[in-house]
Structures are given as structure tokens and as C-alpha cells.
Design a protein with these regions (language model features):
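The feature encodes the CheY-like receiver
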Residues: 16, 58-59, 88
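Charged docking surfaces used in two-component/phosphorelay signaling
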Residues: 17-25
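Active-site beta3 strand of CheY-like receiver
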Residues: 46-52
Length: 121
């Protein structure tokens, strides 16, 4: 059976490490990047099963990246889970409007993150 890949996109290396720590013993192949400008390259190279995408990042925020991925014919079927401290109802609504498949609010527990990833990967 092919190992499921999770692409983690967060400008904070510490946050990427935290997420990797939560998922490393769950059988997923983990790919972490800190630059939202490299998302398309990482997807093309890795073909992830699911993307965990931070919202608050420099240059391109997660809402923008999500919208661009969902409008791209080659990438729109890949589930995107937004991972963010933005936790208002309007933030969640805006994420859905951009095409996000899931939403995890920081701080999150290991179980919350696993539940979201398992739903799609």
C-alpha cells in the first residue's frame, strides 16, 4: 500500500516541527515547507494526499494559496485543511469560500489534528 503524504505549509519552522511530531508515528510521509511561494512546486514533486496550510503567512496568505489551488485543474482535488489561529465564524466562512475542505484552529491537540488528517488522507 502506498504511504499517504501530508504537505505541511507554515512559515514557522517550529509549527512545522510540531505538526510533524504529532503525525510522524501515524504512517504518513511528511513534507514540510516554510515558503508559500513553493507550494505548487512541492505539490508537483510530492503529490500529497492532503495539505495542511497555515493562513497567516507573508507574501501569500493561506486563503490566497487555497483559492489558487482550488482553481488549478491539476491540484483542485487535493484536500486542503486550513490550520490557523483565526477562529471566528467569519474566518471559517471565508476559508470555505476559498475552497478549504477542513479547518483546524490553533492551538490544537494531537487528536484534533489527527481527526482532520484522517478524514481526508
Amino acid at each position: 500500500m502506498l504511504q499517504k503524504k501530508v504537505l505541511i505549509v507554515d512559515d514557522s519552522p517550529a509549527q512545522v516541527k510540531l505538526i510533524e511530531g504529532f503525525l510522524e508515528h501515524e504512517g504518513y510521509r511528511l513534507v514540510g515547507i516554510n515558503d508559500p511561494e513553493r507550494v505548487e512546486e512541492a505539490i508537483a514533486n510530492e503529490r500529497p494526499s492532503v495539505i495542511l496550510l497555515d493562513v497567516v503567512m507573508p507574501k501569500r496568505n493561506g486563503f490566497q494559496v487555497c483559492r489558487e489551488l482550488k482553481n488549478h485543474a491539476d491540484y483542485n482535488a487535493i484536500p486542503v485543511i486550513l490550520v490557523t489561529s483565526k477562529n471566528t465564524e467569519s474566518d471559517r466562512f471565508w476559508g470555505q469560500q476559498q475552497g478549504a475542505d477542513g479547518y483546524v484552529t490553533k492551538p490544537f491537540t494531537r487528536e484534533e489534528l489527527l481527526r482532520a488528517v484522517r478524514r481526508f488522507a
